[in-house]
């Protein structure tokens, strides 16, 4: 149960959270280019009493609290990148009830809540039960390929006993399994030519279209408890209206929360690529993203972590938690056998659209929920 001191702190810090969101939203942070937002976060942490803060090679801002050379660790993270490629500040506005901006919920508001909640424990020099890493991590979105989370697990994996990531739009949500994915950039090349003079030559757009049509004939594997999907998200190609296309490409993916189903999809896609190569068409299939499913996590420890999150949701919100699979920064620790969950510290909608928004009235509950999860790792 949160103490009166914690509750008062959250009430007093609500405007701090809002101001952090405003300032972070003004700093563009596309995946792989989070430098400016990382520098801002590092400066904020240092100005607010964090003594051991560094930006690693993956552009993670890592705040180490009471970390020794060999003690066990817990990780709390929220990502700095947004799904949008913009390198100039994006439109931001607010009214009495909401803030509106691309990326404002995913994951800026979650990050702001993490930062302010972490400040409570650090400024009061609370004794931790283990080492704590507060991380503003990079590259969660899209082709960021979970680079930031991978680096944390690479650097600290054997010492991490539990792992939390704050992401999402519903405070009741507890992500309890990892959705893995493979993402390809597929390029088809043919001889092409002039649309009149070389009529009859092979057209790369035609063969790519045919390949896409073949993909969409697949029936995904059916397995109890598993969900498997596929998608072609981007197609490009051609030169002009009077040119037989020499080159066309697509970005495609498949996903599943089951490792066997994911491998079934890999086999199917690879067979498609080989089929078109056998037609004499050049097919280049580049794996541009790979997110793993859950690995062999000790079930008893994982169940205990989920139970604590469920208890916090019931205590703070008076609501039942919503369990489900998702693709988040938690994929990486789960694949490594580390108990991990993803919860939300914000309520919003329109994620991954230019109309994204958050509910301001939900921020205090998001902070209370996040602080309740952190509280278990500190002495009373």
Please state what every model-predicted region is:
Residues 20-23, 29-71, 91-93:
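A non-catalytic alpha/beta surface segment that caps or lines the substrate-entry region
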Residues 80-95, 160, 177-187, 341-342, ...:
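Acidic-glycine-rich active-site phosphate/pyrophosphate-binding loop
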Residues 70-136, 156, 365:
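Active-site metal-coordination/substrate-binding segment of hydrolases
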Residues 107-179, 253, 378:
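Acidic/histidine-rich catalytic neighborhood of metal-dependent amide-processing enzymes
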Residues 77-78, 135-137, 163-167, 187-189, ...:
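Short beta-strand segments
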Residues 1-5, 185, 189, 193-380:
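Metal-dependent amide/peptide-bond hydrolase catalytic core
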Residues 1-35, 348-352:
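N-terminal capping segment at the start of a domain
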Residues 41, 111-121, 152, 208-211, ...:
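Buried hydrophobic packing segments
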